[in-house]
Amino acid sequence: MIRSLLKWPGGKSRVMPELLPHLPKAGCLVEPFVGGASVFLNTDYRRYILADINPDLIRLYREVKSNPELVIDLARPLFATGNSKEEYLQNRRIFNGTKGLLDVARAALFLYLNRHGYNGVVRYNQSGGYNVPFGQHKTAPYFPEAEIRQFAEKANDTKAIFLCGSFQNTLKVMVGTDEAIYCDPPYLPVSETANFTQYHTEPFTEKHHRQLAAELLEVNRKYGAPVVISNSDTETTREIYHRFRLHEIDVQRSVSTDASNRQKAKEVIGVLKVCEGCGRAGGGNCPDCGPCCGDATYNAMVAAGAFDEQGGF
């Protein structure tokens, strides 16, 4: 298993064995919530479109793809001397307050803050300031030099495209029939006390989940793209994503101050239920599923001569 260069709460490295059988075959994988990029690193699609609303995350990935050795050279001294609260807060002030900071320098600082902050949490205040406290590490955090190089190699070999934007804008790049979508949005809370659902500077609410489910259906019906999602296993999740076939899994939670108290939680992997004939949810008006989405798909099949040998037309 290839490890992420970041510490990332909710990262998929631990559940890749369960997730991989559900990821569809396609030429290109589109991820509107790339996060720690474990799915990218541990799959074999020819191309990738990887997006997130967090500009610091996408900046890091772009710089690692373009300038991996420079990122390593700038980050190494930060890791060598920065394992104290005082150094961390000073570097956080530089990250938040220095105008004109070069992209590669900001990328190196973001990597440092992620690895030295509290449990890899990435959090901002409403003004966009990074506000994660120091993590109080007993030993110096791991410097992911090998992971940086692995990421750069994979990103360049697959010509990965990194986009900074909302899931709505990311899904607009869907233009072909050889693309699959995997979505790992901020999880719906399992309780009132477990409500970490931040999406960069704003909460990712139930309303956003409903919008996401609707847009995924629309993209599938328009292009036939297969869709897979991950989320917490709650009644709300099952109601919002009822068009998906949900597979239950157990996952070790990682956002906790005490590793001994981290318990397994129920999650779901959702695979959009589609017609085997046309690959669309609810059908695309093909002979297997009947009229559901208008005449476009059926007429295209007729025009292409799909039924000529059957003597129907």
Sequence positions of predicted segments:
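Conserved Class I SAM-dependent methyltransferase catalytic core
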Residues: 209-252
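Class I S-adenosyl-L-methionine
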Residues: 245-274
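Conserved S-adenosyl-L-methionine
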Residues: 22-80
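Short, polar loop motifs at secondary-structure junctions
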Residues: 33-38, 147-148, 231-235
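Cys/His-rich microdomains that often coordinate metals
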Residues: 279-285, 293-296
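SAM-dependent nucleic-acid methyltransferase catalytic core
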Residues: 1-14, 22-25, 68-182, 186-196, ...
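The −1 position to Zn-ligating cysteines in a subset of zinc-ribbon hairpins
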Residues: 269, 285-288
